[in-house]
């Protein structure tokens, strides 16, 4: 039995670890040993928080870049909401739900250091958020304007801006990525001009886990143009403590399900001055101020961009998740997950026909192929041994083309993964390779 002793209820790190009858004072432990003990705490707290691990049919889940598992706090709060009556912003009897709903905006504001809680707009996910920006800016764009995207982008960015450009006549420029998978900064500088109206940037790749130097890229954009900047933070939100005001991005989009929240909920946030430029994508209830036979005026932000009945259960559940996440040592949890992924990369290098597509930084993502072996065949055999990973194009065909591959395999780790998961993966991998080679 492992028991964790907290000296104060508000403390996030334990002062003591108790193994059976043995008490270990953490302030008396140094270096690697202390780190291992903290990681034991992370594993235990992580796995206890997720009911998935109590299932008899639970597989080895190594697909966290696709979506994270759901903690009990989310399930409990969502069930509690559905057991009660009411919507939000509608009448007096739903006042408690409305308070929690709006508290979630404040939580998101504080989590990403947004400018104002009114700059937090609920969407169905990152894709919806990006489309909200694209559609909202379209009336301002014309054939003289240019939009910059990159080979590093997810289709949610890449396709959306291509289609937007078609509709308004604007020109698309696709920035190349270098052999280290970072955006070519010289190409960015060359592409920027007074015609550049928007630059869409991918913060962290869902393919290789590569983190772009977003702050430096935005500084270059500010220096060489007056363009608006949109950051796709879908993969960054669960790994990086984002400070939106420090980044100086105009728009930032992410999905709740990437950070232990519910499916079907996302966030668009950014500068109020930038968000105020957006024309609504949808029209209807809640997004209006006054309506008469011949005149309609829209509500202020954020409501003017949130037409219709929102995902109330999702928002309130996400509020509980963010409150729960405040109790984590975010940096230690991330370092632990990275350590698992990096150990896998080291071991995969020992396989003669394995090729890795590593990011220049340590990350929780492992992207690889085996020469002469079909990725789908290998994935199928791993799946049959209860290993859940991702195979395919990862909604990033231009990125895969840059890698020179049609498909790749991807593992992605979270703090609830264990060394036992790693061993199970390699046991399954060796069996699969014996059948395929």
Curated annotation (Swiss-Prot):
CDD domains xref list: SufS_like
Cofactor requirement: pyridoxal 5'-phosphate
Reactions accelerated catalytically: (sulfur carrier)-H + L-cysteine = (sulfur carrier)-SH + L-alanine
EC code: 2.8.1.7
InterPro entries hit by this protein: Aminotrans_V_dom, Cys_dSase_SufS, Cysteine_dSase, PyrdxlP-dep_Trfase, PyrdxlP-dep_Trfase_major, PyrdxlP-dep_Trfase_small
SUPFAM superfamilies in alphabetical order: PLP-dependent transferases
GO BP annotation list: cysteine metabolic process
N6-(pyridoxal phosphate)lysine PTM positions: 258
Alphabetical keyword list: Pyridoxal phosphate, Transferase
GO molecular function: cysteine desulfurase activity; pyridoxal phosphate binding
Broad enzyme group: transferase
Described function: Catalyzes the removal of elemental sulfur and selenium atoms from L-cysteine, L-cystine, L-selenocysteine, and L-selenocystine to produce L-alanine.
Annotated family: Belongs to the class-V pyridoxal-phosphate-dependent aminotransferase family. Csd subfamily.
Listed name of the protein: Probable cysteine desulfurase
Organism: Haemophilus influenzae (strain ATCC 51907 / DSM 11121 / KW20 / Rd)
Encoding gene, per UniProt annotation: csd
């Amino acid at each position: 039995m492992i028991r964790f002793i907290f000296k104060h209820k508000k403390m996030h790190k334990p002062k003591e670890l108790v193994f059976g009858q043995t008490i270990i004072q953490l302030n008396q432990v140094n270096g690697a040993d202390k780190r291992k003990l903290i990681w034991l705490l992370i594993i235990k707290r992580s796995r206890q928080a997720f009911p998935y691990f109590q299932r008899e049919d639970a597989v080895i889940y190594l697909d966290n870049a696709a979506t994270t598992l759901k903690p009990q706090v989310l399930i409990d709060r969502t069930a509690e909401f559905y057991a009660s009556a009411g919507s939000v912003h509608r009448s007096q009897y739903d006042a408690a739900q409305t308070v929690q709903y709006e508290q979630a905006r404040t939580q998101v504001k504080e989590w990403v250091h947004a400018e104002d809680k009114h700059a937090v707009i609920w969407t169905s996910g990152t894709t919806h958020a990006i489309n909200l920006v694209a559609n909202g800016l379209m009336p301002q764009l014309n054939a003289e304007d240019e939009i910059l995207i990159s080979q590093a982008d997810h289709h949610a960015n890449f396709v959306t801006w291509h289609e937007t450009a078609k509709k308004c006549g604007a020109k698309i420029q696709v920035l190349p990525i270098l052999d280290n998978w970072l955006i070519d900064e010289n190409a960015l500088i060359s592409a920027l001009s007074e015609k550049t109206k928007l630059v869409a940037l991918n913060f962290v790749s869902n393919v290789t886990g590569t983190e772009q130097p977003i702050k430096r890229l935005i500084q270059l954009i500010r220096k060489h143009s007056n363009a608006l900047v949109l950051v796709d933070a879908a993969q960054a939100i669960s790994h990086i403590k984002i400070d939106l005001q420090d980044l100086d991005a105009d728009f930032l989009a992410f999905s709740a399900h990437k950070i232990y929240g519910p499916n079907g909920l996302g966030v668009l946030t950014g500068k109020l001055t930038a968000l105020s430029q957006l024309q609504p994508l949808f029209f209807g209830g809640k997004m209006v101020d006054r309506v008469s036979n011949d005149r309609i005026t829209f509500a202020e932000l954020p409501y003017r961009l949130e037409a219709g009945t929102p995902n109330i259960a999702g928002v309130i559940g996400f509020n509980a998740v963010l409150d729960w996440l405040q109790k984590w040592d975010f940096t230690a949890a991330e370092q632990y997950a990275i350590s698992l992924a990096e150990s896998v990369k080291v071991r995969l290098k020992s396989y003669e026909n394995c090729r890795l597509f590593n990011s220049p930084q340590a990350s929780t993502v492992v992207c690889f192929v085996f020469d002469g072996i079909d990725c789908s065949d290998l994935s199928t055999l791993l799946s049959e041994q209860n290993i859940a990973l991702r195979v395919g194009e990862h909604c990033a065909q231009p990125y895969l083309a840059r890698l020179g591959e049609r498909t790749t395999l991807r593992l992605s780790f979270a703090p609830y993964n264990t060394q036992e998961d790693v061993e199970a993966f390699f046991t399954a991998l060796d069996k699969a390779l014996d059948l395929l080679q």
